A protein has these predicted regions:
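Carboxylate-rich, polar loop motifs that coordinate divalent cations or form catalytic acidic clusters
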Residues: 1-169
């Protein structure tokens, strides 16, 4: 359970059907910021909590701060690795099992000062919609961001329907 400005609570149902919970808040020292942007789990069961001022990981009950400065907007598991997108469009990766993130590409280097409005995986590319500079694709093979020539949408939104189709508008 999470709230955009009030941290997060992890609730676990144990084998004996009892429930336990842990609060994550800056005042408890287990979050870099209470303004939650996403919660995602990687293939190893590590929980990633992205905030407007940092990134934390939780694995087997242990919290680690990966970053305390960046404004994260979303995350995406791909293969064995976890990818992160900042509000300004920088793409970071955490290699499976690592405790650090590396910047792979910077949208601001090609698009200037813009912000991410949404994102989606389309044909094995991470498609990034920006508020004012159109649509870009991040290629997981060569770690490059390039303009998406097929889509010309500012401040786009994406919906995935129950048939698996992706609608961008």
């Amino acid at each position: 359970l999470w709230h955009r400005r009030n941290g997060v609570r992890q609730i676990v149902c144990e084998d004996d059907r009892t429930m336990t919970s842990v609060k994550f808040r800056t005042k408890f020292g287990n979050l870099p910021d209470d303004r939650i942007k996403f919660i995602n789990e990687d293939s190893n069961g590590r929980i990633w909590i992205g905030t407007m001022q940092g990134l934390a990981s939780v694995y087997k009950g242990k919290v680690e701060f990966i970053d305390r400065k960046l404004n994260f907007s979303s995350s995406f598991p791909h293969g064995e690795d976890m990818y992160f997108l900042t509000k300004s469009g920088d793409v970071y990766r955490c290699v499976n099992g690592s405790k650090k993130i590396d910047c792979l590409a910077s949208l601001s280097a090609i698009a200037g000062n813009t912000s991410v409005s949404t994102h989606s995986l389309i044909k094995d590319k991470w498609v990034i919609f920006t508020s004012s500079e159109g649509v870009y694709e991040f290629d997981f093979q060569n770690f490059q961001i390039t303009p998406c020539r097929e889509l010309k949408i500012n401040n786009g939104k994406v919906i995935h329907d129950n048939y698996g189709d992706c609608w961008a508008y």
